[in-house]
From Swiss-Prot:
GO molecular function: L-threonine 3-dehydrogenase activity; zinc ion binding
UniProt-listed GO biological process terms: L-threonine catabolic process to glycine
Cofactor note: Binds 2 Zn(2+) ions per subunit.
Subcellular locations according to the entry: Cytoplasm
HAMAP family reported in the protein's UniProt record: Thr_dehydrog (MF_00627)
Residue numbers binding Zn(2+) 1: C38, H63, E64
Known function: Catalyzes the NAD(+)-dependent oxidation of L-threonine to 2-amino-3-ketobutyrate.
Active site: T40, H43
PANTHER family for this protein: L-THREONINE 3-DEHYDROGENASE (PTHR43401:SF2)
Gene name, Swiss-Prot/TrEMBL: tdh
Lineage, highest ranks first: Bacteria, Pseudomonadati, Pseudomonadota, Betaproteobacteria, Burkholderiales
The species this protein was found in: Burkholderia thailandensis (strain ATCC 700388 / DSM 13276 / CCUG 48851 / CIP 106301 / E264)
InterPro entries registered for this protein in UniProt: ADH-like_C, ADH-like_N, ADH_Zn_CS, GroES-like_sf, L-Threonine_3-DHase, NAD(P)-bd_dom_sf, PKS_ER, Zn_alcohol_dh
Name this protein carries in UniProt: L-threonine 3-dehydrogenase
EC number of this enzyme: 1.1.1.103
Length: 343
């Protein structure tokens, strides 16, 4: 089958042919329709330090997808041939304390599709049936293909009650921009997002941001004053991994505020702990998606009017994958879709 793989220890990916995956007793085989390019895939493309330490070579990658079940293992129940599915990209052990307690997103033995094992940038993907998630017919293939990052945004944004709250989001990548739409959808009052990328800040405005602030030109304090915010933000969502953005977020929080961290800052990042301690801030780390509560909430929000369509800005046939990666690398894109229909 055709697949997009890391064949050598260096930058780039190669469209090549690999063996079709075998289907285990508890697996489903998915014929891929659409995939989306993730920030993780950009790390793999660049072959940065993280990728060099993490990605086995050779291996085909990718973990954002939608497709159709074409084969099932003999032990699979609850699915049928022809079901349209996306899937949870974190494969968990099922036996550790967190898995057995229903907290699979905290499994210490997690294996990542397209990171630690063969991925979805291929004509076919085999995964445990447990990880597959049926997509309702009213949700498009394009939106279903981005359920993985949509889930990151949902898990982060819904970590705290947002109804009537003032929310600060630092980092206007696709996940941060989707978090804007989620926060507004569930009832936040002011949703302010910061970045230095005008293209993505404009996307955030289209997704409903109260203010989208280019911090290289505009003061967050001035924006807060314009919005008549006298006490600070109630909830902060850190999506950038940029130390200066995290510092600004902490300084802008109200006393008793709540902070969710999805962005990954450098390991030795220093912060002003006075901001945390004397303000009584609650800080929560976010990894992946809650299985499968996050997935059900994603569907419910889309079915109740959440519009994420502006976040999908580019579409390419898989044979033009280099154009797709170029769009992502340019910084002037939202989500980029690769179409496998003609593969």
């Amino acid at each position: 089958m055709k697949a997009l793989a890391k064949l050598e220890r260096g930058p780039g990916l190669t469209l090549t042919r690999v063996k079709k995956p075998e289907v285990g007793h508890n697996d489903v085989l998915i014929k891929i329709r659409r995939t989306a390019i993730c920030g993780t895939d950009i790390h793999i493309w660049k072959w940065d330090d993280w990728a060099q330490k993490t990605i086995p070579v050779p291996m085909h990658v990718g973990h954002e997808y939608v497709g159709e079940i074409v084969e099932m293992g003999q032990e699979v129940r609850g699915f049928s041939i022809g079901d349209r599915v996306s899937g949870e990209g974190h494969i968990t052990c099922g036996f550790c304390r967190n898995c057995r307690a229903g907290r699979r997103h905290l499994c210490r033995n997690t294996v990542g599709v397209g990171v630690n094992r063969e991925g979805a940038f291929a004509e076919y993907l085999a995964i445990p049936a447990f990880n597959a998630f049926k997509i309702p017919p009213e949700i498009s293939d394009d939106l279903a293909a981005i359920f993985d990052p949509f889930g990151n945004a949902t898990h982060t944004a819904l970590s705290f009650n947002l109804v009537g709250e003032d929310v600060l989001i630092t980092g206007a990548g696709p996940i941060g921009v989707m978090a804007v739409a989620i926060a507004k959808h569930v009832g936040a009052r002011n949703v302010v997002i910061t970045d230095i990328n005008d293209y993505r800040l404009d996307l955030a405005r289209r997704m409903g941001a109260t203010r989208a602030v280019n911090v290289s030109r505009e003061s967050l304090r001035d924006v807060m004053a314009d919005l008549h915010m006298t006490e600070g933000f109630d909830v902060g969502l850190e999506m950038s991994g940029v130390p200066s953005a995290f510092t600004s977020l902490l300084e802008s929080m109200n006393h008793g505020g709540k902070v969710a961290l999805l962005g990954i800052p450098p390991a030795q990042t220093a912060i002003d702990w006075n901001q945390v301690i004397f303000k009584g801030l609650e800080i929560k780390g976010i990894y992946g998606r809650e299985m499968f509560e996050t997935w059900y909430k994603m569907v419910a929000m889309l079915q109740s009017g959440l519009d994420l369509s502006p976040i999908i800005t580019h579409r390419f046939a898989v044979d033009d994958y280099e154009k797709g990666f170029a769009a992502m690398l340019s910084g002037e894109s939202g989500k980029v879709i690769l179409d496998w229909a003609a593969a």
